[in-house]
Amino acid sequence: MGNGMCSRKQKRIFQTLLLLTVVFGFLYGAMLYYELQTQLRKAEAVALKYQQHQESLSAQLQVVYEHRSRLEKSLQKERLEHKKAKEDFLVYKLEAQETLNKGRQDSNSRYSALNVQHQMLKSQHEELKKQHSDLEEEHRKQGEDFSRTFNDHKQKYLQLQQEKEQELSKLKETVYNLREENRQLRKAHQDIHTQLQDVKQQHKNLLSEHEQLVVTLEDHKSALAAAQTQVAEYKQLKDTLNRIPSLRKPDPAEQQNVTQVAHSPQGYNTAREKPTREVQEVSRNNDVWQNHEAVPGRAEDTKLYAPTHKEAEFQAPPEPIQQEVERREPEEHQVEEEHRKALEEEEMEQVGQAEHLEEEHDPSPEEQDREWKEQHEQREAANLLEGHARAEVYPSAKPMIKFQSPYEEQLEQQRLAVQQVEEAQQLREHQEALHQQRLQGHLLRQQEQQQQQVAREMALQRQAELEEGRPQHQEQLRQQAHYDAMDNDIVQGAEDQGIQGEEGAYERDNQHQDEAEGDPGNRHEPREQGPREADPESEADRAAVEDINPADDPNNQGEDEFEEAEQVREENLPDENEEQKQSNQKQENTEVEEHLVMAGNPDQQEDNVDEQYQEEAEEEVQEDLTEEKKRELEHNAEETYGENDENTDDKNNDGEEQEVRDDNRPKGREEHYEEEEEEEEDGAAVAEKSHRRAEM
């Protein structure tokens, strides 16, 4: 049994081992097959790569062979072209040698001709050198003469300038003194005007108070008449009571009527006093009024309640009531006098406050008139309210009148005080707003004036630049024409024309001087006609250059044309002077008409006086600006004077005719320098007048 069991176990083990070996063998075979397959695939891929590489190499070899064949063909073509080019070059070389030989022969012939011409020009140059030396000597002599005359004129100019500066300083002092006097007079006039307005307002207030007092007196009279009628009725009732002995003891209703009759004057007076206290705002008078009215009221109460206790007193006559009424009249007069005093004190306080506000804010007369009108309207409104209060308090002469307590009166007074403070604050704010508006307007005007001044200065600078550029251009043209004349060998004709030009320029300068001396109306030309009149010296220089330069040109043969142009210009001068005179006459006529209109309307005169007070500062600013303009113009005149002198020195090198012209021009300018200053001053005065007229 044991062996059988062992054999079985060994079989099983053997079987399992066999199975394992089979399995492992199968797995090993599979792995070998897989590796062989992979190696086969790699070998196929390598074979494909080599095959493709071989194909590409064969294609490249074919391309190389084709390119080689093409290069061989192109090389053959280039060899043929090179042979042709070599043959053409040999032909061109022969032709070039022939042309060079011809050019050398031509240049030699030209050189010989130019050499001959050069010798001729040398001889001409030597002749011109001699003429130039002669002209230099003449120029030196004339330069010495010119320097002497220039120094003399400069000394005269400095002397005249010093004299004019002294005169101008004196005139400035006189103008300053006159302005100070004018300011003082205007201040005095303004103070008197304000005082007059205050007095007028006080007079109006007093008239209104007088009317109010008349109304109160009439009301008191009507109340007294009503009281007298009630007293008469009371007498009749008393007589009837005395006649009927059974009605000695009065009814309570009659007793109430009696007390109402007794208290009616007191209630009426208190009600009458209430609106006056609301308008006048005087607290102390209320206490006085109540003190005056309290004692008679108590006496009447005691005397009127007495008949209820004793019948004998009803038989007495009503004399105590009349005595009380008579006593009350002087007390009412005293109260009215106290009211008047209080009103006067309040008016004085208001006047003092107004003066204080005027000193702080310094309002204009127009603002004061506006404030007074507003105050007058407020007072009229208060009077209307008072009239409505009267109508509401006692619409008829009834005995029952509502009495106002002291607490309510105090509240009413506080309310009125707050209202007055608010109104005063509103007035101050309104005044400040008006003052700021005026300041803004003044600043805007100053800015506009500055902008206008800058624009004028820019225009003057542009004009000066143009005037400086024109003479240089003309001088260049003149020099070019002079050299052309020298090239054309017409030196002798140029000298003759230069002499004629000198004579014509001298005559024209004399004519200009005669016209300037014989035409004094041109001094008063307005300054604001255009930017050209702002710089008269530069304009005169430009006119002289335009008139003289074309005639001085040595190549210019048209003397007749220049003479005709001068005649036309001289004929046009009287027409321009007539137009200027007509414009001045029109301005004077407009000023006379405005003066007449202002004289015929007194309200307009007062308004103009107020506007003059406001325009003082603007006029001072304008005068300062005009003075600065004058200084700038004088400085520009001096600079242009020096530049013109330098230009004359440069122009003397061109010929004798230019020296004569440059000598005459500064002389004429120095002679007319005073006239130009007067024209500038007159123009500034006319500009100020026109500006004032525009503002008016």
Curated annotation (Swiss-Prot):
Region ranges (Golgi targeting): 38-107, 176-248
Glycosylation sites: 257
Membrane topology recorded in Swiss-Prot or TrEMBL: Single-pass type II membrane protein; Lipid-anchor
Listed Basic and acidic residues bias regions: 123-145, 271-281, 298-313, 324-343, 355-364, 370-380, 464-476, 505-545, 627-638, 661-672
All ranges on the Cytoplasmic side of the membrane: 2-12
Organism classification: Eukaryota, Metazoa, Chordata, Craniata, Vertebrata
Compartments where found: Golgi apparatus, Golgi stack membrane; Endosome membrane; Membrane
Bilayer-spanning residue ranges: 13-33
Keyword Transmembrane helix: yes
Species per Swiss-Prot/TrEMBL record: Homo sapiens (Human)
InterPro entries, sorted: GOLIM4
Record carries keyword Lyase: no
Name the UniProt record assigns to this protein: Golgi integral membrane protein 4
